[in-house]
């Protein structure tokens, strides 16, 4: 994934500082439906994030949307590139809607308040919907 090339060029052209860029991405290190804001850090195996770091530096803001880890390393690629199971639609849709509804806080640079509002509007499921859906395939 080479998203960093395009984002880096646009940031330089429009004179946007990395700290003013927010990247929304899936995160296997967070349970399904969990959400966290973060600034800086490494790529954690994410090729798109690695590309962004190469072209912007690491100091951009990250909205991390948990999709959970499939449990076995060989299942990671199909997990992150695959479609959501129907059982995951409720938490996925609630999380995306909460991210949109809380945007005024993010746009004001209030990342902690944004995270709190997203979590209030879309609490993470108490179980792994993907694991529950495994029997539905």
Can you say where each PLM-predicted feature lies in the sequence?
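Nucleotide and nucleotide-moiety/phosphate-recognizing core
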Residues: 1-40, 49-63, 70-75, 90-136
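Short glycine-enriched, charge-decorated loop/helix-capping segments at active-site entrances
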Residues: 36-42, 80-84
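Active-site oxyanion-binding pockets that recognize sulfate/phosphate
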Residues: 85-89
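Short, conserved glycine- and acidic-residue-centered signature motifs
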Residues: 45
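Generic beta-structure capping elements
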Residues: 68-70, 84
């Amino acid at each position: 994934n080479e998203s960093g090339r395009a984002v880096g060029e646009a940031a330089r052209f429009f004179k946007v500082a990395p700290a003013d860029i927010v990247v929304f991405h899936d995160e296997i290190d967070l349970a399904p439906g969990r959400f966290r804001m973060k600034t800086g850090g490494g790529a954690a195996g994410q090729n798109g994030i690695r590309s962004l770091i190469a072209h912007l530096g690491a100091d951009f803001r990250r909205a991390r949307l948990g999709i959970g880890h499939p449990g076995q390393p060989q299942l990671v690629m199909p997990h992150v590139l695959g479609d959501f199971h129907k059982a995951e639609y409720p938490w996925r849709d609630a999380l995306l809607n909460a991210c949109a509804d809380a945007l005024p806080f993010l746009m004001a640079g209030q990342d902690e308040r944004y995270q709190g509002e997203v979590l209030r509007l879309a609490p993470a499921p108490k179980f792994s919907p993907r694991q529950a859906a495994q029997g539905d395939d």
